[in-house]
Amino acid sequence: MKNEIAAVVFFFTRLVRKHDKLKKEAVERFAEKLTQILQEKYKNHWYPEKPSKGQAYRCIRVNKFQRVDPDVLKACENSCILYSDLGLPKELTLWVDPCEVCCRYGEKNNAFIVASFENEDENKDEISKKVSRALDKVTSDYHSGSSSSDEDTSKEVDVKPSSVAATPSPVYQISELIFPPLPMWHPLPRKKPGMYRGSGHQTHYPPPVPFAYPNPGRKNKPFRPIPVTWVPPPGMHCDRNHWINPHMLAPH
C-alpha cells in the first residue's frame, strides 16, 4: 500500500509544482499531510487478493459534480494552503488499487497507468521516475490535463449561487382548467315506511327535485335546490292525509 500511496503523492506534487503557485516548503508539507490521510483511510480497505474490492472508496475524483475532493481538501487545510493554489484539473480521477495506480484526465478521455508494482521493495526514486514518465507522456497527449469541456486548471472552488432569482410562475391544477366545480349534494331525509302510501290505493312518491347548476358568482356557498310545489292531478282529493282517485272507487 505504501508504494501506491507514494505514487499518488508524487503525482499531486508534480502537478502542484508545475502550477508554480506554492513554495517548496508548502508543497512538502502538503505531501506529508496527504500521505497520512490516505494511509489512515486505506488501511482497512486494502485487498491485495481482490484489487477491485473497495475501488470506489479509494477513488480520488474531481469533476463538475464534485469540484473538491474531500481528502485533498483536508490535506490542504492541515498544511495551511488553499485548494485553488494546487492548480488541479477540473476533471481528474485517480484509482488507487493494489499494485496499480491509474488516472484519467476529463470524464470522456481514456485512463492511463500512473504506476504499477510487482513487489513492495521499490524505493521512492523508482516510484518518482514512473510517475514522471507517465505524466510527461500524458501531458503531451491531453494538453496539460485539459478536460473535455473546461479549462485545464481550476480558478475557483467556491460554488456561487446565481444572482438572478427565477420568478415563480403561477400553478394551476388541470381540474381547475377543465372541470367546473360541482354543486354540493344535500341528501333528502330518510322517510319512514308507509309514508306516501295508501291502503289499497295507488302509491304516490314525492316529485323529484330538478337539478340545477349553482350561480358561478357564489362558488364558496353551498348549493340549495329550488323548492317545487306539487300540484295533484285534476279529480284527486285528499281524505285523511291520503290522495284518492275517484275513478279507482267507481264500480266497473
Curated annotation (Swiss-Prot):
Pfam families found in the cross-reference section: BTG (PF07742)
GO cellular component terms, A-Z: cytoplasm
Highest taxon, organism lineage: Eukaryota
Function of the protein: Overexpression impairs serum-induced cell cycle progression from the G0/G1 to S phase.
Protein name as annotated: Protein BTG3
Organism listed in the record: Mus musculus (Mouse)
Ranges for region Disordered: 138-163
SMART domains: btg1
Tissue: Ubiquitous.
Family designation: Belongs to the BTG family.
GO biological process assignments: negative regulation of mitotic cell cycle
